[in-house]
Amino acid sequence: MSNIIKQIEQEQLKQNVPSFRPGDTLEVKVWVVEGSKRRLQAFEGVVIAIRNRGLHSAFTLRKVSNGVGVERVLQTHSPIIDSIFVKRKGAVRKAKLYYLRERSGKSARIKERLGN
């Protein structure tokens, strides 16, 4: 039974997901339904957490919009995600960057990762 579930989950995994880590800045294009129309909406933010669970993997993006912090948890292999683009690689030492929630301005900056 579990082999069948694993096979079905393997078929539903997206193949075009780039590799990213906490601290990276991503631009995610998400399908948004408004009434009867569908359109793409871009959400750009810093990855503050990643949850690796195969088909159920998720990541949390954080951005500051008009002085208000906005966080969005997205399923990595969700059909509403059209594309993921890594804009900037950040150098951080932690896997979960929840401390960025309390910081603003220059203290919330993340250094750029050089090399790989």
UniProtKB/Swiss-Prot annotation:
The keyword Ribonucleoprotein applies. This is Large ribosomal subunit protein bL19. Keywords: Ribonucleoprotein, Ribosomal protein. HAMAP family: Ribosomal_bL19. GO terms for cellular component: cytosolic large ribosomal subunit. Belongs to the bacterial ribosomal protein bL19 family. InterPro entries: Ribosomal_bL19, Ribosomal_bL19_CS, Ribosomal_bL19_sf, Translation_prot_SH3-like_sf. This protein is located at the 30S-50S ribosomal subunit interface and may play a role in the structure and function of the aminoacyl-tRNA binding site. One of its GO terms (biological process) is translation. The keyword Ribonucleoprotein applies. Gene3D superfamilies: 2.30.30.790.
